[in-house]
Amino acid sequence: MKEMKLYLIIIISVVMSLGACSKKNNAQPNLVEPPVVVPPPPGGTTTGFTISQSLNQATPNTDLDMWTIYSSATQAATDFKPLPAGYDDKILSFVLPKGNMAVFAENQDGTGESICYVAVTSDVKENLPTRLVGKVSYVRMVPFRNISKRGVGYTNFNDVQALKVAWYYNWGFNLVSIPSIQYVPMTWGKNAASAANASVFIGRRDIDHLLSFNEPDGLHQANMPDIDDAVARYEFMLKTGLRMCSPAVTQDNATVDTRWLGQFMTAAAAAKARVDVVALHWYDWGSQTNDKSTDQLNADAILSRFKVYIARVHAAYPNQSLWFTEYNCNPTRNEAVHLLFMKSSAEYLNSLSYVERYAYFFPGVLPATSGTPNYTLTTMGKTWSEIPSPSSLTANVIPK
């Protein structure tokens, strides 16, 4: 109880001291190292995470600790240990206990060929795929929070708490998770994707995913026209051993091979840079003036276009889960259409197993709360807060 009280005091102090970070502001936030939320297992405690030099988890095998990065590299840092003797490039199978995720990588820094497993409904007992047999020099297991799908992007934590979402992000990496709400850091632009920040992320105990660049195809956002440089920056974050989300591009640059995200995914595959989740933005751009005679007909037509877009993206990236980190029916539309689309789109996204998370983007003229000092929910905010949402994942994640 004392630790929980201290934790809440730290959270409140951190949140109150941080200025708002706008999505539309190119300035990178200062990184604030968060408190430790989940301590590592005490000495002598077995985690149940077992690696084996044989197929089907047979002997010889050994257990590894939670949070620690095991590598063939020599590291003096607290969060690193050498792989047990005889296991570098010798791991053939493993047991991952339920409620955790694990990354196995070819290179000692977590880059190169790699794979991320998530044990959601049961322990995962697997042989490594052929592409990693005799190659693993990096292993990390961290706890995985299988939270519900509905979240929000907001720069003020008071708004986030009022909305009663399961997860949030703020286009930066300077806030923290609390027991009821998970935080997902974002390396908004290329300067945020650095070895120094990767080291800090490794030390955090309140995160299991990372969002990467925000609209790198846009001149007024991350603005990263050099695809090879974007992949190289992205690879810094692979060193964390966390589950990785792709850069989130504007809606028209997501599904065509010759557009920004298609080029990035092709280059990432060539570099063997793992992408676990594709992050997406959608605002019905191009149809925002194509309105119907009633709000309901308009919302229905928008939902139909959204469904087509989702199908196209899923067809383009069938091996990745999807997160809609920004979406709405268009900032120019009225509140009635937003409310209708908000409910119908969430219901549809809830029905898709390959869509893990989604976050409605509240237009400036239709905020989620009244703001300071009371942060009372508006009609928009109340509607979003009351939408039911299932768990992000309903099965173990076992890539091939």
Range-by-range predicted roles:
Residues 86-89, 149-211, 217-218, 227-228:
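N-terminal carbohydrate-binding/catalytic regions of secreted carbohydrate-active enzymes
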Residues 137, 179-189, 348-400:
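Aromatic-rich peripheral "rim/lid" segments of glycoside hydrolase catalytic domains that contact
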